[in-house]
């Protein structure tokens, strides 16, 4: 929390102790309460946006500013796995209903503690009079009074509101991390005119493809189809197949049973390949939906043709990739990834120009915000 407090102080030098305490509270508890009426929450968001005071966003070519002290135009870190998405992001094409869903879902999921809040307040006191040029004794008096009130949620100070016109929603930092993608999706859905919108989320092992797919499902109620359900069956595992870039997946079956049926009124039906039993197992049925996500390595296989409205590639640094796989799969499976699956993926990425042909390349680092 220390770094977050310093960065906010540098970016907003007219902050008062009240504003820093609010930031610490948000890092621990988010908005501080469940949203019991999402409809009313959306109406308040829309009214706040219509009464906006920040002026036109003026985003060139609709591009999002980068995260950081010089790029907090749309997203700013709040610590504790939370961030603030500013309502100015709606100027880019993000739908109010999408931002409200982020807010509602984040409020339902956040888990904080008074002990964590106290730790943040202690860090703030240690910074006052040094990195943060607020009087330490005055800050101590404010915090003591705040503790006496039972650590409530607080508003921004009048000075902060007058100087910076804060207008944002506090949400899980993952939403801020992928905000450019959500803007792009909202634009596509708005322009679709009743046809299906299909996107591919390809990329490196451990880059967060499945996590992103879950976020998309929660926000949009879309279908998600996983390439991992289409591993090769035993009769397909021949040397010639493994020498083929992108051959480590049953792309023929995926195209026939999923890609070719995305716009069918009957929906999609297929069997999942069970790696343990080495055979096709349960049947998945998915209705036709306006928005479909194809998730996983090999989702942009050239065999599928030009079937996507948007191609996304997720990447992550090698050291972080290794550590994520170790945490998720264990040391033994990490060796298999390094010796077998990652080299196959890399061969596919290179031979098929997957990264180069993607319209969005997103780096998914743990410490982005």
What residue spans do the PLM features occupy?
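Long, basic/Gly/Ser/Thr-rich N-terminal segments
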Residues: 1-160
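Pre-Walker A (Motif I) flank of P-loop NTPase domains
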Residues: 194-199
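P-loop (Walker A) phosphate-binding loop of NTP-binding proteins
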Residues: 204
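Hydrophobic positions on the alpha1 helix immediately C-terminal to the Walker A/P-loop
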Residues: 212
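Conserved nucleotide-sensing/catalytic segment adjacent to the nucleotide-binding pocket
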Residues: 223-226, 232-286, 291-294
């Amino acid at each position: 929390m220390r770094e977050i407090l310093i960065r906010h102080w540098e970016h907003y030098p007219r902050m008062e102790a009240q504003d820093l305490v609010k930031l610490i509270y948000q890092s621990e508890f988010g908005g501080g309460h469940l949203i019991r009426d999402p409809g009313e929450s959306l109406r308040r968001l829309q009214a706040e946006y219509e009464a906006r005071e920040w002026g036109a966003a003026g985003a060139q070519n609709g591009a999002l500013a980068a995260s950081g002290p010089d790029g907090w135009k749309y997203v700013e870190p709040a610590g504790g796995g939370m961030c603030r998405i500013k309502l100015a992001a709606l100027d880019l094409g993000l739908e109010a209903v999408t931002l409200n869903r982020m807010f509602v879902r984040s409020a339902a999921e956040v888990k904080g503690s008074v002990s964590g809040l106290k730790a943040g307040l202690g860090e703030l006191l240690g910074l006052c009079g040094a990195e943060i040029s607020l009087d330490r004794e005055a800050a101590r008096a404010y915090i003591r009074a705040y503790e006496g009130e039972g650590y409530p949620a607080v508003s921004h100070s009048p000075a902060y509101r007058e100087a910076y016109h804060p207008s944002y929603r506090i949400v899980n930092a993952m939403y801020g991390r992928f905000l450019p993608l959500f803007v792009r999706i909202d634009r596509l859905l708005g322009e679709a005119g009743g046809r299906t919108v299909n996107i591919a989320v390809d990329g490196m092992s451990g880059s967060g493809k499945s996590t992103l797919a879950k976020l998309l499902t929660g926000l949009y109620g879309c279908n998600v189809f996983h390439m991992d359900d289409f591993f090769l069956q035993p009769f397909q595992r021949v040397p010639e197949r493994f020498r083929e870039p992108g051959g480590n997946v049953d792309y023929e079956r995926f195209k026939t049973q999923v890609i070719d049926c995305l716009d069918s009124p009957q929906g999609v039906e297929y069997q999942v390949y069970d790696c343990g039993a080495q055979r096709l197992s349960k049947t998945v049925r998915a209705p036709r939906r306006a928005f479909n996500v194809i998730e996983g390595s090999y989702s942009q296989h050239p065999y599928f043709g030009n079937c996507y409205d948007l191609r996304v590639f997720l990447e992550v640094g090698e050291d972080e990739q290794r550590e994520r796989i170790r945490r998720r799969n264990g040391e033994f499976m990490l060796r298999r990834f390094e010796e077998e699956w990652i080299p196959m993926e890399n061969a596919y990425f290179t031979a098929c120009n997957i990264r180069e042909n993607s319209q969005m390349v997103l780096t998914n680092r743990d410490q982005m915000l």
